[in-house]
Amino acid sequence: MFRFRALGSVSFAALLAVPEVVLAQPAELPSVTVQAPGQRRPDIATVAGDRSGTKRAKRASAKPVTSTVADKPLTNALGTYNPALDLPGLKLPPGTTLTTAGPVDGYRALSASSATKTATPIEQVPQSIQVIPRSVITDQNNVTVTEAIQNVSNVQGTNTLGIGTTGSFGGMTVRGFSAQQYLDGLNNMYNVGDRDSLVNVERIEVLKGPNAILYGGGAGSPLGGAINVVSKLPTDKASLETGLTLGTKSYVQPYFDVNQPLSPDKTVLFRFTGDYTSNNTFVDVVHQDRYSLNPTLTLTNKEDTTLTIQGRLSRLEQQAYQGLPAVGTVAGSFRLNPDLYIGPSSIPKSYSDVKSVTATFDHRFDPIWSFNIKARWADQNADQRSQTTLSAAPDFPPTTWSLQNIEVLQMQREISVNPNLEARFRLGPTNNVWLTGADYSRVTDRSHMNADLGVLPVDLLNNPVFPTPYTDPSPASPTFFSYTDVDSVYTTKGLYTQLQSTIYDRLHVLAGVRLASINIDYVENYPFSLGVFSPTQFGSDTTRALPRFGAVLDLVPGLSVYGSYSEGMQASTFVQALNTNVQPETSKQAEAGFKFNINDQLTGTVAAFDIRRQNVPVVIGLGVGALSAQESKGYEADLIWQPTRNWKVIASYGHTDVRYSDSNTGTPQGNRVPGVPEDSGRFWVDYSFDWPALRGWSAGAGVYVASSQYVDNFNLYKTPGYFTVDAKIAYETEHWRAAFNVKNLTGEKYFVPFTWLGGQVARGDGRAFYGTLSYRY
């Protein structure tokens, strides 16, 4: 067990020792950078002032530099009407950069839309929301979304060796429970295609805990949290960035980002991003090829109306990886080769792809009223082929496992629509933002899990050879078996209203309610599917009011306390044969904590939470064994420290105790939910040199630490804790950037739980080197 709790106590004590908070006074001119997409970040030498309040050495003396109040609308600063910048009165620290997703000060995003669906300062949201801006992704040279979200406490990403869908099982988790990944505020059900591409990512917003008020679509509203990936959008300044990343295991990734106004008056804007990645992995046989293409067209009158149309074409191909059995890796008296790929090397590649179109229309009627509507059509497919083991321990001791050829095919079509009406107004001593809206989503899901049982067993320890070739299971074969063959339709509808009020500029209250409806039609077609012996139809239709409320109280300038309560509801997917009237999952969260901002240098959130979840499907072997109740309790801290423009520090720590609170699945009450470290944390520091001889150079290093995790529901197997160290050095000019990164610098060897059929683990990536060279104007 790592000594995280002591570390948290030391951090808290250090916080209390910080000198008295000083309220920043308005400066004469706003030190704000309006940055084109491909433009170099502000050079340290050109920033109006230092966070310490004075210019640096060899510069003329100046008055202390302080925050600037945005007394003029920012909504048109980037050449379009952009509601993400509708932040009147927001204090902008010197050097703030305006992006299409909101203002950013170094590593710190000043606002976010994911928590309220309105542009809101993060310090006024009574819930933990963390933002990973583009500046962090660039400095750390993150190569996957999973790597980027490790900067946030109590968040675990999808294993990058996995392929296929990541719905209820095997996806991202927040505070110990499954979290849904959203794309630009709309559901991204199953998250297929190249889900780790970062070329089109402006920022990643992580909202912790259920938030049914604002999020529906797919199978329903998130239960553990929402991870909203915010895309890059066009601006009115032409720019280009193109680059190439090379790395360990034949890693090759060319990428581009082109932003170009198409009309002389800059009312027609276009942006196109894309990348292609080819790499081997640290597992034998597995080779990945993936690409992502993202064209975006914006039509705007530059004052109060904008229409944006986003396209997405993304695909991932690789040999399906199933992990390794727990016995022989983290348990048992023998050790398998951690690089072993189970299955013949000639196995055909699996694939996961998505094609989608998203349209967003924004219009401001007057200074009070505005309207927004989003709509998306998506075509998503995944075909996963494997020769797989079925158990964590040998079927034929001491070291031989039985195998099956298994194909999991899924085809989804999704349509989502989400209109919103917003009003901003003053009433007596209050500033108010009222939001009302509706959403509708329909997902059709055609899927099967077919097997061929006629595969010879293999000794996985002693020079394993796989004599039976992989072939797609066919009903014509005498050894064919279908575990599941279903047609599903998930229809979600919701009406919601929300009021945000700031009272006497000190108390920030949020309250809302959603009337949510989830309709599930589930048809099991194959007569011998798991637990079903004739074609059978399941379904449920549930309507429920889901509240959310909370408040932030500013104790003194720069220090606030907050508390909140929220609920979520989601369809219980993949619950074949359990019940003909399966009720949706539900969750309830209570959260309390404090937020601080000390002179725009040390900022962060410290929180404690309690989440209770009902009707949770639990995978046991090849199917869902039962519906369980689970509870997650814990605490966390997310800090950013930027004492000067040279230094940028991220520190996060989370403690999560997530357990089964009943024994309906056959697991003892009190067992821990697998795949969740009890303690985890991230620390990263970056330094930019401004000495004349080293100007343009920067260096950084960090560490990620996670404690042990259970592999299975019965808590029989457990992976040890581990840590990884990464480092980078970079050189940047106005047009060129070169960076060199090392990940897992110490070559730590470790395993993590891998969601497959229960009882599997995956090896962690070894030491890897990456070099990136890019050009921009």
Predicted features along the sequence, with ranges:
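Acidic, small-polar-rich N-terminal luminal/periplasmic segments of exported/outer-membrane proteins
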Residues: P37-K237, A592
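Outer-membrane beta-barrel translocator/receptor signature
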Residues: N200-E202, A212-P295, N301-T305, K355
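Acidic/polar loop-and-plug regions of large Gram-negative outer-membrane beta-barrel proteins
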Residues: T277-T281, L293-R364, W377-Q412, L456-T484, ...
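Gram-negative outer-membrane beta-barrel transporters
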Residues: D505, D610, A626-N713, T772-R776
